[in-house]
């Protein structure tokens, strides 16, 4: 489980995130929406211990984000879209094994995990190809496999499907559903409202660093008198924000 209580981040005079509070349960996919600059990525980076909050608190699996950052990090899988962040000179297998070893897995355990994840993501035939020779879709699958190789309880996804073709996007969506069924806690930040509607149990909308809406799709539509998520989003976040 993951919980935020008035989590805040200021960059000098800029209030990037302002007293954001919400919680995400095990087996839940939580969608985090907002226009560019709304504070989505800053929020995820704080949860991933990549940024230190200015104020407020957060806990992951009962661990305090500020007091136990190293322990918190071991419970998190993180994937940012756009750049898979692979080591181009290493093969797909080596990329996964290397990260697994960094997370404390034995060589044998890391090797088995690489094989099983390659099967799950359907890139077994590319396991021994250098990462630089692989397509964007395959690279993103490998990056996703790498970020869950240590079996984290909490997954943070920031635009994980950006630039992927329809088939690769479907593969990633299906695997996110599988992770949910396994009881993982997932936050998904994505500009694609259709993906958010399909995958997310609840949705939070950020606007200028503040959480302006929180609830299920039906709750958001009923509360705001809207017919769908797109209408809710533009009503609360502003059509000129995108």
Short names for language-model regions:
Residues 196-198:
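A short, surface-exposed alpha-helical micro-motif characterized by mixed small hydrophobic
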Residues 97, 101, 108-126:
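Conserved ABC ATPase "signature" region
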Residues 130-134:
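Conserved ABC ATPase signature
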Residues 155-158:
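Catalytic Walker B motif of ABC-type/P-loop ATPase nucleotide-binding domains
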Residues 214-215:
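ABC ATPase "signature
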